[in-house]
């Protein structure tokens, strides 16, 4: 069995003035083997056009992985190598780690904005 990796996916609930609106990430925690493909889901109910995936490593601030300004629009951030995203609707921006590596062990955050 290959080396196991632990991915901590932070559940990030953002406040935008709507009590029933939210942004959710899943799974909340993920352990996988090196080389496996991993997908982290991000779903928002605000109907925001802009969505973002960040990672935060020990001793560092947030670093942008990928972002989207609307359906079918995806862009690379500063640390996009080894990751991909897709945006087939307004609500979702899944992040895929193509081949999990120990260098991708991190806390992941999804965010959205108008």
Curated annotation (Swiss-Prot):
This is T cell receptor beta variable 10-1. GO terms for cellular component: plasma membrane; T cell receptor complex. Alpha-beta TR is a heterodimer composed of an alpha and beta chain; disulfide-linked. The alpha-beta TR is associated with the transmembrane signaling CD3 coreceptor proteins to form the TR-CD3 (TcR or TCR). The assembly of alpha-beta TR heterodimers with CD3 occurs in the endoplasmic reticulum where a single alpha-beta TR heterodimer associates with one CD3D-CD3E heterodimer, one CD3G-CD3E heterodimer and one CD247 homodimer forming a stable octameric structure. CD3D-CD3E and CD3G-CD3E heterodimers preferentially associate with TR alpha and TR beta chains, respectively. Residues 1-21 form the signal peptide. It is found in: Cell membrane. InterPro entries: Ig-like_dom, Ig-like_dom_sf, Ig-like_fold, Ig_V-set, TCR_beta_variable. Disulfide bonds join 42-110. GO terms for biological process: adaptive immune response; cell surface receptor signaling pathway. It comes from Homo sapiens (Human). Gene3D superfamilies: Immunoglobulins.
């Amino acid at each position: 069995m290959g080396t196991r990796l632990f991915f901590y996916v932070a559940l990030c609930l953002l406040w935008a003035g709507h009590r029933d609106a939210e942004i959710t990430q899943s799974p909340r925690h993920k352990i996988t083997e090196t080389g496996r493909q991993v997908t982290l889901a991000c779903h928002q109910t605000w109907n925001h056009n802009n969505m973002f995936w960040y990672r935060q490593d020990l001793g560092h601030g947030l670093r942008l992985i990928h972002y989207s300004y609307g359906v079918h629009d995806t862009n690379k951030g500063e640390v996009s190598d080894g990751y991909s995203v897709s945006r087939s609707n307004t609500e979702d921006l899944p992040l895929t780690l193509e081949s999990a590596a120990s260098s991708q062990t991190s806390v992941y955050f999804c965010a959205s904005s108008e």
